[in-house]
């Protein structure tokens, strides 16, 4: 995805509403968006079996980047594939694994998000992890999925600072509970509407089903709330 607009971000990396020492989310402040109820965590992890982990890379004045990993379930994603689809709207990106998602409609790996120039490093590490899972010893073709945004305004993107150890750490930290949001993982260096962007998540429950989303916000324009 292209970098956000060139207007300087108007919020520091660690700014935001807080309740005590805990960073507050909208519903913590009594703000309820929409009519449908959310799940227990108001997160993508309210979908049964889904877990999320982050690894953040920071170096004062130089690096604000990282990787976020979404595990579709706790089993072997290659052996227990899931139905999947892909829609691209009003943008372009460097999404690894897009063709098989479109053509076969199956997900057979975890999904990772990172910075644009880290995509292939993360994909290589994610493939190593997948091939090393028990039961995958004879796998000769696998489709990992890695998305990205350009965090080059707040990080030295050419450093390609996310490596295999960060992917491993993100997977190891993946939890099916509350999801850490904001300037963390793949959201560490993002900018949105001229403000600090980050990782966001939510869920809604309808008719006995749970819909969960996770976003890596990084785009330009002006936000007008009327």
Task: Briefly describe each language-model feature range.
Residues 2, 6-226:
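Alpha/propeptide regions of enzymes that mature by internal proteolysis
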């Amino acid at each position: 995805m292209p970098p956000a607009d060139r207007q300087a971000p108007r919020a520091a990396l660690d700014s935001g509403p807080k309740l005590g020492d805990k960073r507050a989310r909208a519903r913590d402040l009594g703000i309820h968006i929409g009519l449908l109820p959310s799940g227990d965590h108001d997160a993508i992890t309210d979908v049964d079996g889904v877990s999320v982990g982050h690894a953040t890379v920071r170096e004062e004045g130089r690096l604000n980047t990282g990787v976020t990993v979404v595990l579709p379930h706790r089993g072997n994603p290659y052996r227990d594939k899931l139905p999947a689809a892909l829609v691209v709207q009003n943008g372009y990106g460097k999404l690894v694994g897009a063709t098989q998602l479109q053509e076969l409609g199956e997900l057979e790996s975890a999904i990772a998000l990172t910075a644009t120039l880290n995509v292939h490093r993360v994909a290589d590490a994610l493939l190593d992890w997948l091939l090393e899972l028990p039961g995958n010893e004879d796998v000769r073709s696998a489709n990992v999925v890695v998305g990205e945004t350009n965090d080059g305004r707040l990080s030295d993107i050419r450093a390609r600072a996310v490596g295999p150890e960060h992917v491993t750490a993100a997977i190891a930290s993946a939890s099916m509970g509350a999801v850490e949001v904001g300037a963390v993982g793949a959201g560490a260096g993002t900018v949105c509407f001229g403000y600090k962007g980050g990782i966001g998540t939510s869920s809604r429950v309808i008719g006995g089903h749970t819909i969960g989303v996770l976003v890596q916000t990084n785009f330009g324009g002006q936000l007008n709330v009327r």
